[in-house]
Amino acid sequence: MRACPFRPAACRAGRGFTLVELLVAATALAILAAIALPAFFEQLARARRTDVQAALLEDAGYMQHYYASHDAFSGTPPPQLPFAQAPRQGGVAYVITVAVPPGDPSSFLLTATRAGGMARDPCGDFTVDHLGRRELVPGTFAPDRDAARCWR
């Protein structure tokens, strides 16, 4: 190590960061993370909601095609949904099921139930019926959410 009796600042510059500089950088990083992470996770949830909405609408189109071929939404063989989960690949965020009311083969209700990382999503579970009505399952969504806000 070289001696710097006349210029101590020049010697210190080559040794790295001070503790104060490190704490300032860590604080700045923590503030950025506190702001950015919730926004990132909300965007991720919105993308998963968009995936399930697209899958529900495609399944509804399939059910209409099934009705055109069988004159009923139920029958033999029963309709097998092309998309029983959303997203289509990867981890399951929603499970999609179809229900045909007994005695009314001319109607159906598709329901997407939250699963995995979306189990606590405030938008709740999504539904689409034979008339194309897009709703949320009552009791599954937060008080500040409604179908218009979640189905966009």
Which sequence ranges carry the predicted segments?
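N-terminal leader/signal peptides at the extreme start of proteins
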Residues: 1-17
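N-terminal single-pass transmembrane signal-anchor helix
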Residues: 12-40
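Membrane-proximal amphipathic alpha-helices
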Residues: 41, 45-56
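Alpha-helix exit/C-cap motif
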Residues: 46-50, 61-79
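Generic recognition of well-ordered alpha-helical segments
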Residues: 54, 58-61, 130
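Extracellular/periplasmic head regions of type IV pilus-like filament subunits
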Residues: 69-133, 151-152
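Short, low-complexity, Pro/Ser/Thr/Gly-rich segments in the mature regions of secreted, periplasmic
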Residues: 144-152
